[in-house]
């Protein structure tokens, strides 16, 4: 009970980060009362938030957010009771999870989120056209494979030897994730192999953007 319920954890043990409103502005503090900046997971609020160098909580699109020793683009809610919380889902044709834009590394990448398969480019933009794409996947040796897309959702991926339906891709994603069912509290990057292998590139709700102290 008590404040222990509000703890998140890193390699060094418990880390308590809470959002506190001061004169109409939100700030983040650790268990020692020290103001925090950067990307923070606030368990009591159930999400990720970003605080600038002055400690102010940011909303909207934020570029160059440090995460896993690299910089990414994030989007943080601006309304609807989740002000400042990392956005989950599609916004302006970009795919986000816990605020982090889901970018391909070099070409195009498949993602399984909330029951559907999406294909994004290096800027996290969801592709809408059915055509050939160079997909980042260790199981695809060909440079270009045919991807059928309808209403932004991938319907099938066809290599020279096999066609994978959306249902096939969902099963592959769930096998990679290691759970019976991937919920909307997770996103799976289908980048390892188009086979049923336990080689997960998945990211659970609390495992994205964890800041170490």
Please tell me what each predicted stretch does.
Residues 1-213:
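Extracellular adhesion/carbohydrate-binding repeat motifs centered on closely spaced tryptophans
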